[in-house]
Structure formats: structure tokens, C-alpha cells
Amino acid sequence: MRGMTGDHIGHSLRRLEDQRFLTGRGHYVDDFAVPGQLHGIVLRSPHGHALIERIDTAAARAMPGVSGVFTAADLDSDGIGALPCIAQVATVVPMIVPPRRALARDRVRHVGDPVVFVVADTAPQARDAAEAVAVEYRPMPAVVDAREALAARAPLLWDEAPGNLSYRFERGDKGAVDAAFAKAAHILEIELVNNRLVVAPIEPRAAIGTYDAAAGSFDLLLTGQGVHSLRRQLAEAVFHMPLERITVRAPDVGGGFGVKNFLYPSGCWCCGRRGGWASPSNGSPSAARSSSAPHRAATIIRGRAWH
């Protein structure tokens, strides 16, 4: 810790960082505001699995203060890439990684899947406009049990992943293990169920993106636990631009527990290519914030597992 010298092993140490937080002097993303800042609200899927039949944004675009209403078509026209998968864990055959985009195209695959991003002068205006967006869905069969998802006739979630299997992970010597079981006098079996888990930090995720038209660069302020990795993912996979043209900053983080290590779509929404998502006319900064309930619906979770 800063300002401490000497041998501290085996001794109680006085923490140096707590006073600032306990006296309300912490600075979180929601404490920041940029002149001319716009506000973004995302409309999410209420279905676990459905086809997107139609999106009507006309009423939302006509509402007061609305700067833009964006769908997956805007991702395509701006050349915004899919969010990368950083957990390459397959050991048997190459891992199948379907493209996870910042806004769903044609199909939603989980409750909370982002579909439309609305930008307006104020957060209430953006929220009202999001409610005016009309999305027609055709519900599809869905499963919530991983074992059922691997069944022969289970509904297919991704065309790229036959049988809903992304990867197989194995470690150790299977032959030696089989031989040990063959020699064992007794074999005991037990099923362990690891329940669904949702990480719930006090501070939900938030992001503020600023575009510098003169330099052609982005500045992204977010609730993150690994700015260097997030910056590299945005540059290489999402915006396809030189690393030095993207700055990612994280102020104080109100709890993370690992869930804020990942790149979420909010970074794409708040920046967008050439500042077009923030404002088609002047590249105004854009902010997207989540309350606790949407945070749970839009955060990486650990599903129920069987061992």
C-alpha cells in the first residue's frame, strides 16, 4: 500500500483507501457529466428465444429530445463488429463462438437481449421514446436447463453450434482414470448441483462515451475492472481501428467481483463509429446507465451446473 515501508508480515495494517469512500468522496461513473451529454436507454427482449419480425421506430424518432434510435442495421452500416469471446477454454476440438453483437439481429436468444438503443437529450426522454418502439416477436421454443439443451431434439439456439455445444473441456489422462476405476473395489457416484448465480454489485454498470471528430478518437469512461483488455477488444474486434485512438478509463468501481472484467455492449452504444451513435450531427457525448433490475437481466451470469 502507498506510503508504507518496513516489514508488515504478521502485523495488522491500517488501510489507506477507506476514508475517502466512507466519507462520500468516491467518484463513480454516474458522478461524471460531460457538457452536451446525451442519454441512452436500451430496449431489451422479454423473450428467452424469439424471431424479430419487425421493428417500428417511427413514433420514437418523432418524440421530443430524441437524437437517434438504433438497431442492428446500424451496426452493419457502421461496420461495428461482434463482441469477442475472451474465454477460449476448449481442449478437445476448436471452440465454436457464434457472433455476439451489441444489438440483436433477426433473433433474440435470452431475456434481456438488447434490441434497440435510444438516444435523447435527457434520460426520461430516452426512456419514454424506448417505450414507444414497437417490436414484433415470434416466440420460439426455449430451454433453461443445460442438460435439456444438449438433448437430440432441443431447439437450436445458434446455427453455428450444432447440438447447442460450444466446447468440450478435458484435463488429465483419461486412460489412467478408466484403469483406476476398473481396479476399484467400490465406486461411489454423487450428483452435485451448482445453482444459478447473479453477481450483484451495489453500482450497476454505466458508461460515458466521447468522440473527438478532429482526432478521430474515442474516450470511454466505464465501470470496468480491466481497462487495457477492454481497450484492446474495442480496437481490434469492435471498431477495427488503431489502439492509440481509443482511451478507456475506469474511476472508482462500486463492486465488481469479476463481472465487470468483460466487454459489454454499452461500450459500443456510447461510442459508435465516428461518433454517429452519440449524435449524427455533432458527435455529442453519450451516456448509458443501468439500474439494478436491468443490470441483472443484462449481465454475464453463471447458469446452473451439474457435476
Feature locations, PLM:
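Beta-strand segments within the central parallel beta-sheet cores of soluble alpha/beta enzyme folds
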Residues: 72, 244-251, 278-288
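Thiamine diphosphate
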Residues: 256-277, 282-284
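Acidic, glycine-rich active-site loops and adjacent beta-strand->loop/helix elements
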Residues: 75-76, 224-227, 251-256, 285-292
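Phosphate/diphosphate-binding loops
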Residues: 114, 121-122, 278-307
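Short acidic, glycine/serine/threonine-rich loops at helix termini
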Residues: 80-84, 129-132, 231-234, 257-263, ...
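Conserved beta-alpha junction segments in alpha/beta enzyme cores
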Residues: 176-238
